[in-house]
Amino acid sequence: MSQVILDLQLACENHSGLPDEAQFQRWLDGVIPQFQEASEVTIRLVDEAESHDLNLTYRGKDKPTNVLSFPFEAPPGIEMPLLGDLIICRQVVEQEAQEQDKPLEAHWAHMVVHGSLHLLGYDHIDDDEAEEMESLETEIMLAMGYEDPYIAEKE
């Protein structure tokens, strides 16, 4: 049994062709248990309008984005296994996969890995942080049987 509880929310209009719950569970299980014990993650799949609104509200960016991470911060003295929420925009993920000539499944997996690392406190604001985070993403993706998501940038 998985140590990561997944709450999958399908808030996008078209559900056709989306990864299934088992795939999202596999991707979470590939990253989170390496860093902490039992936890719960909500993954909400949204359309561009919701992604755009959230990205503008929380990041000041006036466009939709691939993944937003919202870590849960429990009040002092309360311990809960809730790690946080990932908001993933279907259209942006599909467009990026096509533009970057990546298999769609691999790009979905990468967005879950990338967002999960943000929930765990990793970031890519400065070069050192970015290098560490990208290295972890690559290691995790390779362990799950996918290619290095940054291979095109390294060539």
From Swiss-Prot:
Binds 1 zinc ion. Its EC number is 3.1.-.-. It is found in: Cytoplasm. Single strand-specific metallo-endoribonuclease involved in late-stage 70S ribosome quality control and in maturation of the 3' terminus of the 16S rRNA. One of its GO terms (molecular function) is zinc ion binding. GO terms for biological process: rRNA processing. Its cofactor is Zn(2+). Signal peptide: none annotated. InterPro entries: MetalPrtase_cat_dom_sf_prd (IPR023091), YbeY (IPR002036), YbeY_CS (IPR020549). The keyword rRNA processing applies. SUPFAM superfamilies: Metalloproteases ('zincins'), catalytic domain. Its main location: cytoplasm. It is an enzyme of class 3 (hydrolase). This is Endoribonuclease YbeY. Gene3D superfamilies: Metalloproteases ('zincins'), catalytic domain (3.40.390.30). Zn(2+) binds at residues 114, 118, 124. Keywords: Cytoplasm, Endonuclease, Hydrolase, Metal-binding, Nuclease, Ribosome biogenesis, rRNA processing, Zinc. GO terms for cellular component: cytoplasm. It comes from Salmonella arizonae (strain ATCC BAA-731 / CDC346-86 / RSK2980). The keyword Cell cycle does not apply. Belongs to the endoribonuclease YbeY family. PROSITE patterns: UPF0054.
